[in-house]
Amino acid sequence: MDRISNLPNEIICHIVSFLSAKEAAFASVLSKRWQNLFTIVQKLEFDDSVKNQGSLMDFVNGVLALPVTTRISKFSLRFDSFLKRKLETGLVIGPHVVNRCLCNVLKRGVLDLKLEIYGEDGYLLPSEVFTCKTIVDLKLTSCIFAESYVIDVIPENAFLPGLESLFLKSIWFSDLRGCAFQTLLSACPVLKTLTIYDVQWEKWKWSRTVSSATLERLIIQRTEFTYFNGSDFKSITFDTPSLTYLKYIDFVPEEYPVVNLDSIVEAKLHLILTGNQDYPVRYLGREDDPITSNPTNLIKGLRNVEILHLSTATAQMLCFFPRETLPEFVNLHHLTIGPTYYECFNWRLLPILLKKTPNLKTLMIKGPLHLYYRDFNDDEEEEEPEYYCECSSGCNCLLSCHMEVLEISHYRGTTKELEKLKHFLGKLSCLEHVKLGVWASSDKEKLSITTDLLMLPRASVNCKIQINFS
């Protein structure tokens, strides 16, 4: 008997996990003992972007050659383009070859299925993917600039009873007879996490509804903001009563008819208004650029949130709607605004937010307290318009605020920033900890900034200032 056969079963199974499908198939016929150990293959993966990976056909044949009793826990396939493969190798490897392999894998109790199909030549998933009873984690990835992954039909018997996590990247849904997207969600009775990356709603044909009674985490992230055509971007409904986490990066549609986010705990928002629904608003309020987006219902639907992250664009957006738009966030204890590297935070919003957050404990500003920008045609730094960076001297709500932690990530020690910080420290009587990320070019500047900060009067005797120089 060889040395490997003397190893414990656990170690042999670990070795097996590093074999290709073809090697696993060959190894399974070495002996009855090895064949029994091959009843479960932990992971099979093919990535044609990796050199010396071997051919896709060999991989497929290896999968098909596995004993019928072999189970596969995790299956991953990354394939660039059927057309490209034909041009490079002369082999005709069509979608039917990949789908034959997939259908075989789906019969082997697969738990984790990851498919990355890139290219411009189109690809349709086999319907068996949507009736697999064992999948727990499903990831489907395509290319944002091509219709290479379109789901236009979900079978009537679609049912994924074990699916807990669904990841969709650059996937389009197009069903002229109904809504393939909602049909898919309805087929997932225990779905907990949904990620929609590289989303382009305006290219979908769907009911404009995200509905799931079990969903707990939802990530919607648009990555392409340049070629936006919002002519058919009218509304989005969120009916997710169990949702606790929301990350939402996108343009704002004309309306949110229904928003059910009663269980929300944490939300991260980067939302951009549009004018005439065809391009981002850059000069809000102009008569020739009317605002057609309306986030009112969405913001009101977040009233139970405990941790809220607002991008600068989102915070600025809220300034263009009546104060009544903001509900009272009675559960909110942590508020983050920013980053503010390229956009300025409209400070007029802060008093409004503080009045609406009676139980706020932590305020984090990812950026400076006062913004300067550089005109690329000039070497001088200039201040932003005063209405953006007006000081908080009139912010009487600070006197009744129970904030305990204030964090500023890009403090520079300028006169305007020092003045603004003075108002915070002089009025926040419950403040315990101030964290400042400070940029300084010399030891002399560090000493000057530190001295100025330590000299500031504080309403709270327990307030400590932590300075982190970079």
Swiss-Prot record:
The keyword Repeat applies. It comes from the Eukaryota. The keyword Repeat applies. Residues 1-53 form the F-box domain. InterPro entries: F-box-like_dom_sf (IPR036047), F-box_AtFBL13-like (IPR053781), F-box_dom (IPR001810), FBD (IPR006566), FBL60-like (IPR055294), LRR_dom_sf (IPR032675), LRR_FXL15/At3g58940/PEG3-like (IPR055411). CDD domains: F-box_AtFBL13-like. LRR repeats lie at residues 114-142, 143-170, 173-198, 225-250, 287-312, 342-367. Keywords: Leucine-rich repeat, Repeat. Gene3D superfamilies: 1.20.1280.50, Ribonuclease Inhibitor. This is Putative F-box/LRR-repeat protein At3g58920. The lineage of its organism: Eukaryota, Viridiplantae, Streptophyta, Embryophyta, Tracheophyta.
